[in-house]
Amino acid sequence: MAGHSKWANIKHKKAKEDAKRGKIFTKIIRELVSATKQGDPDPESNPRLRAAVEKALSANMTKDTIKRAIERGAGNSDGGEMDELTYEGYGVGGVAVLVETMTDNVNRTVSEVRHAFTKFSGNLGTAGSVAYLFTKRGEIIFDDVSLEDEIMLVALDAGAVDIENDGESLLVITEPDTFGAVKDALDAAGYESSNAEVTMSPSTTALIDNIDDAEKVMKMIDMLEDLDDVQDVHTNVDFTDDVLAQLG
């Protein structure tokens, strides 16, 4: 996808900053609990849980905290019920946005999400309004493009769908249910990824070519991600090189 690397790099940078501030811990714990409730408490047989555990470890969460979250999800400790809901809408410039939430108060969550869209000239839409623009898939990113041939052999043999090279990074694409197996194979072969996740990938992008709109989009995304109930934000935004440079 054109522009993937640019947006992926921004997301990766933001994730590191979020981890430093500590706010990502609450979101990871919720994901650990939810993934356990919806599947096996053993990460080896639950790809979603395994991905959540890897995210937790990369954020330097202690194994004891991870264990307690899994036990809570398995019903071995107290914890209130959480609803998982996805909201859809548009930002300025026709940028499509998917907001994944986990909440114990739906009214509070929808109000906060709508406020973030409205504050930065966006619109919260109805179910299905932008979801069709995204496909769920696994993405594993490597920074060393010189390893393309070696990584391709291992990834495709393990069940990867495709590999993209934009000159700055390699993107290994998988089906959601084979993500864990492909990542395990690459890890076992000694290839360390810079980012790996099952995400919602856009089929088309909305190109932003002016800094004013770009800042509105980024501020809206930041505000959404800062909400306690929001687990993840997916968008089809892309930026021209000039705008990207101005964003820093």
Swiss-Prot record:
InterPro entries attached to this UniProt entry:
Integrase-like_N (IPR017856), TACO1_YebC-like_2nd/3rd_dom (IPR048300), TACO1_YebC_N (IPR049083), Transcrip_reg_TACO1-like (IPR002876), Transcrip_reg_TACO1-like_dom3 (IPR026564), YebC-like (IPR029072)
Give the primary localization class. Answer: cytoplasm
The cellular location(s) given in this protein's UniProt record come to:
Cytoplasm
Q: Which family does it belong to?
A: Belongs to the TACO1 family.
Gene3D superfamilies, per this entry?
1.10.10.200, 3.30.70.980
The UniProt entry, under NCBIfam families, shows: PRK00110.1, PRK12378.1, YebC/PmpR family DNA-binding transcriptional regulator
Provide the GO MF annotations for this entry: DNA binding
Q: Which organism is it from?
A: Psychrobacter sp. (strain PRwf-1)
Q: Which Pfam families match?
A: TACO1_YebC_N, Transcrip_reg
What's the superkingdom here? Bacteria
The protein's name is: Probable transcriptional regulatory protein PsycPRwf_1013
Instruction: Give UniProt keywords alphabetically.
Output: Cytoplasm, DNA-binding, Transcription, Transcription regulation
GO cellular component terms, alphabetically, are: cytosol
Sorted alphabetically, the Gene Ontology BP terms of this entry are: regulation of DNA-templated transcription
